[in-house]
Amino acid sequence: MKLWTYLLYPSLLACLSLQSQSPMPSVRGSCDTLCNCEEKDGIMIINCEEKGINKLSQISVPPSRPFHLSLLNNGLTMLHTNDFSGLTNALSIHLGFNNIADIETGAFNGLGLLKQLHINHNSLEILKEDTFHGLENLEFLQADNNFITIIEPSAFSKLNRLKVLILNDNAIESLPPNIFRFVPLTHLDLRGNQLQTLPYVGFLEHIGRILDLQLEDNKWACNCELLQLKNWLENMPPQSIIGDVICYSPPPFKGSVLSRLKKESFCPTPPVYEEHEDPSGSLLAITSSTSDSRLSSKNTSILKQPTKAPGLIPYLTKPSTQLPVPYCPIPCNCKVLSPSGLLIHCQERNIESLSDLQPPPHNPRKLILAGNIIHTLMKSDLTDYFTLEMLHLGNNRIEVLEEGSFMNLTRLQKLYLNGNHLTKLNKGMFLGLHSLEYLYLEYNAVKEILPGTFNPMPKLKVLYLNNNLLQVLPAHIFLGIPLTRVNLKTNQFTHLPVSNILDDLDFLIQIDLEDNPWDCSCDLVGLQQWIHKLGKGTMTDDILCTSPGHLDKKELKALNSDLLCPGLVNNPSMPTQTTYVIVTSPTVAADTASTLFSSLTDAVPLSVLILGLLIVFITIVFCAAGIVVFVLHRRRRYKKKKVEEQLRDNSPVHLQYSMYGHKTTHHTTERPSSSLYEQHMVSPMVHVYRSPSFGPKHLEEVEERNDKEGNDAKHLQRSLLERENHSPLTGSNMKYKTTDQSTDFISFQDASLLYRNILEKERELQQLGITEYLRKNLAQLQPEVEVNYPGAHEELKLMETLMYSRPRKVLVEQTKNEYFELKANLHAEPDYLEVLEQQT
């Protein structure tokens, strides 16, 4: 009985454990054991990055749930048939940064729902016709940074929904004809390959829907074969984004942009393109360059048009040249790329040192040592590899790079050091890499980069530093380096200065800064303004704030500057570095002024700034016009005033108003005796209009008094006329008659009447200073009878005008020995106009 108990007890425990564990994989899969999972919008996101996975069978996913799967930076080397058969609900799969060198036929079977596939940063060399079988709904394919040299003609023929294809940074020299005939591409990236030409027939004619085409960093041969591409680019719609085609050869055009070259300069006699048809009706139009071609493992069929018997189209099959296979070090695999190059595959071979590869192969072109256990790279390890163009040391355990380890690699263009244990970078590590264009340092533990680290690489274009531990960068670290793509994401940056770091990236096309713990404070204002200056598509993703708490997960670009740093703009007393630079250096002052102007344009939208400047300009124009009108008006008034003054100067009567309200003072001046009359000037006729104080009623009283004192008046009048005859106002040749006296004027018929009227008007005439004058001088008048005084009425009318009209604050100049004479400049418009009218 005990024996049966001992036998059944383990079996019972095993059954219970299976029953308790069997439901878990069906519900959670690898989420509880191997991977990290989260659900978002009903879709599972399964993160299996850096888990050491080398077989897809290690992955199990929840059933009947759509999901995104990330297998970044694992140890996958090959994709076998039906490897993804258990992942039928996958929407996207990321296989980047592995060591995948081959994909078997049917590897993607069962992925009918897959929309995105990432196989970038692997070791693929060829894309076969059936590589992507089973991906009928694929829309996005990323295969950059591999070693792809060959793409077979029907590799993409089944991808009828593919819109985005990324093939940059491979070694593609040519594309087969009609490769995209049935592919509705809108975005195509072919940067960093070996392309020399792209013909219209068989290629350009099938990408008419393209919106974004990147063609930089290829070996374009600017000759007549490139004329079709130039014509096609010129006819593209303006909304399309087309990268620059920069000539690589011939030497006279190296570095020139194709779009700026004239057709006659690189193709004096345009060729006549003929279409050659094969029996299947396809056009053979794209061929690789004969000067730098790679030979595939298959035979190449060359089609020639016959010069005789045009009815026959013979096919000449030329076998590929059999090159002697050079020595290949064990345990590596070698492949001949061309008569002058060798590709050496040594990945995943447990190699600890390059000294194990002895003797070194002859004339190696590419050396792949990814996925080994190399700890140290010695200076002597690569001495015999001076012909290398690509060196892959990714996913090793390299901690030390001796100074000068790459000294002999003067031809090296691509260097992969990703996935190692490097902690510090310095200048000595990269000595000798004068031709290097691509440097991959991601997924290390780099904490410090010393100044001048990248100076030995004057041609460096692509730099990957993502997924490290960087917090700061030294000043001028990118100065003089023609970088076009920089990846700094997933580091420890809280802020990144623009001055002396980011503003040295003069050739920048793309930069990655996301997934850093950005502190959205005053230190990030400059970075925000710099981001606003970047062109569309330069930033691959948005920068999100981590601190302070109220700005967590806020997009930096969308924040206002005053929210990042309150009071920064409105605090003029805050000392800044530019304040001191302006005083000390004129050169830096100009840079500071441009910086201030650029800051202004960043803070204010350009459209608003232009509108404001336009308003200011219009305001200035109107102000200037107003000033001109005012000046002209003043000039006209001045001229008019001069004319009036001339008229006053020509008149014997001068009245001048006092400028003040006080009593006027009397000024005595000398006046020429008869200058006016010697110039034959006619004395004005002054009509005395009866004022209210001397009207008809007053005249009746005067007549009554005249009856009593008539005789005295006659004597007084004669005396006045006699003295007037000797007055300076009259010339010696003038004769007057009293009989010419007009009835319109009021005459003096009684001396007492004259004095009485003067006394009544004395208060009003005090400002004129005439009363005292009359009291002193009229008593001395001796009347004479029978004096002929023909102009006496003019003088009398003038006297009556001055005495009986309303006083105007007039300055009257008088002399002691003469009959009173008026010498004042007239400024009283109503009286003066009346005088002029009567004179006329």
Swiss-Prot record:
Q: Where is the composition biased (Basic and acidic residues)?
A: 717-726
Q: Report, as the record phrases it, the tissue specificity of this protein.
A: In the embryo, expressed in otic cyst, lateral trunk epidermis and underlying mesodermal tissue, limb bud, maxillary process, cochlea, retina, tongue, tooth primordium, central nervous system, and primordia of visceral organs including lung, gastrointestinal tract and pancreas. In the central nervous system, expressed primarily in dorsal thalamus, cerebellum and medulla.
Indicate, by first and last residue, each region the UniProt record lists as having compositional bias (Polar residues).
727-736
Ranges for the LRRNT domain? 22-67, 319-360
Cytoplasmic-side stretches of the chain, per the record, are 631-840
Q: Where is the LRRCT domain?
A: 218-269, 516-567
Q: Which InterPro entries match?
A: Cys-rich_flank_reg_C, Leu-rich_rpt, Leu-rich_rpt_typical-subtyp, LRR_dom_sf
| Cellular localisation | Cell membrane
Q: Could you list which ranges are Extracellular topological domains? A: 23-609
Region feature Disordered, mapped onto this chain? 717-736
Annotated transmembrane regions: 610-630
The record's disulfide annotation reads none
- Any one GO CC term of the record: cell surface
Q: What is this protein called?
A: SLIT and NTRK-like protein 6
Origin organism is Mus musculus
Protein encoded by which gene: Slitrk6
